[in-house]
């Protein structure tokens, strides 16, 4: 069934990858890597109903030409029997390089599925979408079939997708049949003339391989042995299951080298004797540096730009002054009670004490703001310029895996996700180092086909962007630019190219938007066909009996006429959102290592791309397995599944995650982030956070959707301590930091001002030396040497995944091109080609995304994205900082990424509710900053403490917003009299607040309007969503009631009628009740207070002015909320008036009943106020 060389995999409609070992406890199929056996390729067939079943005995007999009888006992055994034919003169294995290329083409055209208690299947996709796939890297790309009778294999193809025909007669022949023809005389089956080239290497260019020495004993090098590694093997390390030879020991301890790509440099005294210069001399195990490193002038990749002292020093001084004034004011308030209204005084003092603490927690982390700058020219010079160690100028940049997450195509339109994918594929980063993984947590065919359409359109869009330096590289945003698109474009063919691409994009949008109807019509047609067949079979079987109605589950069908293994439109068993198999489809296979330039007028490419590299990055569709009874852990679980599958398939040492509605606005953003990771000291940076920027927001930013105070003030300030918090998207991670390892040279901080006034600590030399030697460390282990036998307990039983960890650690190191660079790697180490994909690799990826893989491991606890909170992003970043990792805030001149934000009031409140609920969960969990380790700086701890505490301010804020109204109702005030001392304190506190705001605006670059909008929404959110979050958090902690949230709906991006239509839609929610009541009560209180003062015998204007001033202060903050209730033309839902009026009247009457006015207060002579 399978050729002995492993290269000629013949398959029918689908292939099945079955695991060979099973655990005795639950029958769970073990991962191939876990047991050491690589997955075996066997076969299955597709039934008329679209399902896959193993070949029956009759099928196998007919396929193999066997007419003899087989016993029932041997039949089942035969189904999974694997025959390996030994090599003979008539049966020689295919060349490994050609075999790997053929298998990669098979893998890229197969849909892999599998999971719990099921085999892993590889279904060959003849077509992925209704339209034709034109790019040779794309799944289902057009290819010819072999012309030999009885052979349905694909013809060999080159990197452009063109058929490779070894004879001048252009007879189409596959690799297996060509090898057979050569053995049987070397004559072409078509024209019968002898082949001029009889070696596959002459027909298909052999893939370059690493110049590693062969392992002893003539054993073939395995896939993992061809990868880089840096860790020395240990006895406890997981061994290769050959039984004869420990490949890991040979890999980690060999003296072979391949230039500076080896993990161990020669000693200093060996550099001049052939150890350096890229020649590949012997290894001494030392850590000396080649001479060429020290001879080059060294330039940093990044610079820290400090805030001018003329701005920062007054800013810090004002913080101290305001802190002192607040302390004196609170002390004065406590001493001077209002005997006439003790209840009013008590409530106000408690609220003011909390506000003072809240302001302190918010302000202290802002003491050390910094700005940073990158130098992309230096990055290019260091990593992409020909050098003695890299004579061809191949990119030495590390690999980068991009994660895009989506869950529901109904709320996250496929067109938005497709545009995000296109912007990633077109990014300015080495194509062979970039991989994009799309996580579809809903398992929807709509998302799958939308991604396939995006991969097809990328064939034209990506080269067009590279040719004309297009910005931004999101087609929807680019074609909607309001500026002149032809400005600064020098190529004469730009106008023609742009018009053609615009026309193609309009057709692409039509195809994407019509996918739901297309899938529904296709599924209905196939379902009707299956019902007719079932009824026909039933009639034939029933004869004259009464025929009952046929009930067949209505499946969702793919474009090639097979069942979709994920979620069906009408959910069924094993095909629902929470119950479906794991799915992996390589939409775009890994590109070749060398540039591939297009041609003019080429079929499928009507544009001239003769000077443009037309390769595309690898694109993979992933939908993790979900089964009832397993906690899927929402987005965090999906991200962890991507971490594991990407480690098996590409293992980029860095990971960047984006939400489906956040696209790449700056094509060089990846390079900017990599500058920080590759600079001196970059090995201690756990992640680089980019600011979030938004589009489609109303010009006045009514609900502070831009959130610039947080992103430009708070985050810049945190960058001066240990770094910004992780905000969920637009973040570049170091892979081993996500794995839970400690950073190199981690320190403990005991001082409270270590960021502004660092203290030097004496560290033992032996300790430093051991940290430099040790590549991977975890605080959980006391051993100086990492015990690799513990890795399966942490990361699971996948050897592929475990073996990839030291590789990712080494590839993520900065260049050791300066004496100050610690824990670096030599230049040229990452210029080697990356391995081709094979079936066993993708099968292993299926295994690690199964629903059971995380059982009894530390995924979600200490490894990967952390579970247990709706704000898993903040918790994940906190854990990294708690281990000692640093983070960096990368603010680029041109926005790195842009996304969408909910401009509707209700959606915005629910978004804030979700964030605040996560903060409450953090406060009541072990992730509370009060329990942080000593590796976290004091001010960073304060910042995280504020993250967990800020929702509780809502309790005191609501009380304080009612105080002005209560003051006006009662005729009292929070102080006995408005004396000079109180007014002086109030004036100084207000002035210092305004001056601090001005200075923050100065060093952060935000506008005064943005600062004011933030203040307004702070009160709106604090009196609505934050209060609900506190109540929900307390219910979860006390009563164990779980909290669930729905996805925030994203705009489809194609609403041309009114860009801000959502802004005027009023959707009722209970979160609106508290702000409405506050507004109505304060308005009524102003009217009551004003009437009482006018008609009283002794008017107390000072108390009236004090109450009215604070009431107007509250109402001014709630103005955007009131405006949002008015809708487009002042149309407010009747329910709003009913609820607010009833509640306001009830509160007013309740107050009058509790504290009625004195009988001698006459209003208008005869009228007595009740």
UniProtKB/Swiss-Prot annotation:
So what EC number does this one have? 2.4.1.-
Q: Which residues form a coiled coil?
A: 527-551
- The domain of life is Eukaryota
User: Biased composition, Low complexity: where in the chain?
Assistant: 10-24
Q: Where is the composition biased (Gly residues)?
A: 273-288
> Where along the chain is the active site annotated?
441, 873
Q: Which molecular function term from Gene Ontology is one that the record holds?
A: cellulose synthase (UDP-forming) activity
Protein's UniProt keywords contain Oxidoreductase: no
Q: Which InterPro entries match?
A: Cellulose_synth (IPR005150), Nucleotide-diphossugar_trans (IPR029044), Znf_RING/FYVE/PHD (IPR013083)
Q: Where in the cell is it found?
A: Golgi apparatus membrane
EC class: transferase
Which PANTHER family does the protein's record reference?
A: X-BOX TRANSCRIPTION FACTOR-RELATED
Name of the featured protein = Cellulose synthase-like protein D2
Q: What is the lineage of its organism?
A: Eukaryota, Viridiplantae, Streptophyta, Embryophyta, Tracheophyta
The gene name reads: CSLD2
């Amino acid at each position: 069934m399978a050729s002995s060389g492993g290269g000629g995999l013949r398959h029918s409609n689908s292939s099945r990858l079955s695991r060979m070992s099973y655990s005795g406890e639950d029958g769970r199929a073990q991962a191939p890597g876990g047991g050491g056996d690589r997955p075996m390729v066997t076969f299955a067939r597709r039934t008329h109903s679209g399902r896959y079943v193993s070949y029956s005995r009759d099928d196998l007999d007919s396929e193999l030409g066997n007419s003899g009888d087989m016993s029932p006992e041997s039949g089942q055994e035969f189904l999974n029997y694997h025959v390996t034919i030994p090599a003979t003169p008539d049966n020689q294995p295919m060349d490994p390089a050609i075999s790997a290329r053929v298998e990669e083409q098979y893998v890229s055209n197969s849909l892999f599925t599998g999971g719990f208690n099921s085999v892993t299947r590889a279904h060959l996709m003849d077509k992925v979408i209704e339209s034709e796939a034109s790019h040779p890297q794309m799944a289902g790309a057009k290819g010819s079939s072999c012309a030999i009778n009885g052979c349905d294999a694909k013809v060999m193809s080159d990197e452009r997708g063109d058929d490779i025909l070894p004879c001048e007669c252009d007879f189409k022949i596959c690799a297996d049949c060509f090898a057979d023809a050569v053995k049987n005389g070397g004559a072409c089956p078509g024209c019968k003339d002898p082949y001029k080239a009889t070696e596959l290497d002459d027909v298909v260019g052999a893939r370059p391989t690493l110049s590693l020495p062969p392992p002893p004993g003539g054993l073939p090098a395995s896939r993992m042995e061809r990868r880089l590694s840096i860790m020395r093997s240990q006895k406890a390390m997981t061994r290769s299951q050959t039984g004869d030879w420990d490949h890991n020991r040979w890999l980690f301890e060999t003296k072979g080298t391949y230039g500076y790509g080896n993990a161990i440099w020669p000693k200093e005294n060996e550099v001049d004797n052939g150890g350096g210069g890229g020649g590949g001399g012997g290894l001494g195990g030392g850590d000396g540096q080649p001479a060429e490193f020290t001879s080059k002038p060294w330039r940093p990749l990044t610079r820290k730009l400090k805030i001018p002292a003329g701005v920062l020093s007054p800013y810090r001084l004002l913080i101290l002054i305001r802190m002192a004034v607040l302390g004196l004011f609170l002390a004065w308030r406590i001493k001077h009670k209002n005997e006439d209204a003790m209840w009013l005084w008590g409530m106000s003092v408690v609220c003011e004490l909390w506000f003072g603490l809240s302001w302190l927690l918010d302000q202290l982390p802002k003491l050390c703001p910094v700005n940073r700058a990158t130098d992309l020219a230096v990055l290019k010079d260091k990593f992409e310029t020909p050098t003695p160690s890299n004579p061809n100028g191949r990119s030495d940049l590390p690999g980068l895996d991009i994660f895009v997450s989506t869950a529901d195509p109904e709320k996250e339109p496929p067109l938005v996700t497709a545009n995000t994918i296109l912007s990633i594929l077109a990014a300015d980063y080495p194509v062979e180092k970039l991989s994009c993984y799309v996580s579809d947590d809903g398992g929807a065919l709509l998302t799958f086909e939308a991604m396939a359409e995006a991969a097809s359109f990328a064939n034209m869009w990506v080269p067009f962007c590279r040719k004309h330096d297009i910005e931004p590289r999101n087609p929807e945003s680019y074609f909607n630019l309001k500026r002149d698109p032809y400005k600064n474009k020098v190529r004469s063919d730009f106008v023609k190219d742009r018009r053609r691409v615009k026309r193609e994009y309009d057709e692409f949008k039509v195809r994407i938007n019509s996918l739901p109807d297309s899938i529904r019509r296709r599924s209905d047609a196939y379902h009707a066909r299956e019902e007719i067949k079932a009824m026909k079979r039933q009639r034939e079987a029933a004869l004259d009996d009464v025929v009952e109605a046929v009930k067949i589950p209505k499946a969702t069908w793919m474009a090639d006429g097979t069942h979709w293994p994920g979620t069906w439109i009408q959910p069924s068993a094993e095909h629902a959102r929470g119950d479906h198999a794991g799915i992996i489809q390589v939409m775009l296979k890994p590109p070749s290592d060398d540039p591939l330039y297009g041609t003019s007028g080429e079929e499928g490419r009507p544009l001239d791309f003769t000077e443009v590299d037309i390769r595309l990055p690898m694109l993979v569709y992933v939908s993790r397995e979900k089964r009832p009874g397993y906690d899927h852990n929402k987005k965090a679980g999906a991200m962890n599944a991507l971490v594991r599958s990407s480690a098996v398939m590409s293992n980029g040492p860095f990971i960047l995650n984006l939400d489906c509605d956040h696209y790449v606005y700056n094509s060089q953003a990846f390079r900017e982030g990599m500058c920080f990771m590759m600079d001196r000291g970059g090995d201690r940076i756990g992640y680089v956070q980019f600011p979030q920027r938004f589009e489609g927001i109303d010009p006045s930013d009514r609900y502070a959707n831009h959130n610039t105070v947080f992103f430009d003030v708070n985050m810049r300030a945190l960058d001066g301590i240990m770094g910004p918090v992780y905000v969920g998207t637009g973040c570049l991670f170091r892979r081993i930091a996500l794995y839970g390892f400690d950073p190199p040279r981690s320190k403990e901080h005991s001082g409270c001002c270590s960021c502004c006034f660092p203290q030097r600590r004496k560290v033992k030399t032996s300790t430093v030396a051991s940290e430099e030697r040790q590549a991977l460390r975890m605080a959980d282990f006391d051993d100086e040497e990492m015990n690799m036998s513990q890795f399966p307990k942490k990361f699971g039983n996948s050897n592929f995944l475990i073996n990839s960890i030291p590789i990712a650690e080494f590839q993520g190191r900065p260049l050791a091109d300066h004496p100050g660079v610690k824990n670096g790697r030599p230049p040229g180490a990452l210029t080697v080609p990356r391995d081709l994909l094979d079936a066993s690799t993708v099968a292993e990826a299926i295994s690690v995304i199964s629903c059971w893989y995380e059982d009894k491991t530390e995924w979600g606890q200490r490894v990967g994205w952390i579970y247990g909170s709706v704000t898993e992003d903040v918790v994940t970043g906190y854990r990294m900082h708690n281990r000692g990792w640093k983070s960096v805030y990368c603010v680029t001149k041109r926005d790195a990424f842009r996304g969408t934000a909910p401009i509707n009031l209700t959606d915005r409140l629910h978004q804030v509710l979700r964030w605040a609920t996560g903060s409450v969960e953090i406060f009541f969990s072990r992730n509370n900053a009060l329990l942080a380790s000593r590796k976290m700086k004091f001010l960073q701890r304060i910042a995280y403490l504020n993250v967990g505490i800020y929702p509780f301010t809502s309790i005191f804020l609501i009380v304080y917003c009612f105080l002005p109204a209560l003051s006006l109702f009662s005729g009292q005030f929070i102080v006995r009299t408005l004396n000079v001392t109180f007014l002086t304190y109030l004036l100084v506190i207000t002035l210092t607040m305004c001056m601090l705001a001005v200075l923050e605006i100065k060093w952060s670059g935000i506008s005064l309007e943005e600062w004011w909008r933030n203040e307004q929404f702070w009160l709106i959110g604090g009196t609505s969503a934050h209060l609900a979050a506190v109540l929900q958090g307390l219910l979860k902690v006390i009563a164990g009631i779980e909290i669930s949230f729905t996805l925030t709906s994203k705009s489809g991006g194609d609403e041309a009628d009114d860009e801000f239509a959502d802004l005027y839609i009023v959707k009722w929610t209970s979160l609106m009740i508290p702000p409405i009541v506050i507004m109505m009560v304060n308005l009524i209180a102003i009217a009551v207070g004003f009437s009482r003062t006018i008609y009283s015998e002794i008017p107390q204007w000072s108390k009236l002015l004090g109450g009215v001033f604070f009431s107007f202060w509250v109402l001014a903050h709630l103005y955007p909320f009131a405006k949002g209730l008015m809708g487009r033309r002042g149309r407010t839902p009747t329910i709003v008036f009913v609820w607010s009026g009833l509640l306001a009247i009830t509160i007013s009457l309740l107050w009058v009943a509790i504290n009625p006015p004195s009988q001698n207060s006459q209003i208008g002579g005869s009228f007595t106020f009740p």
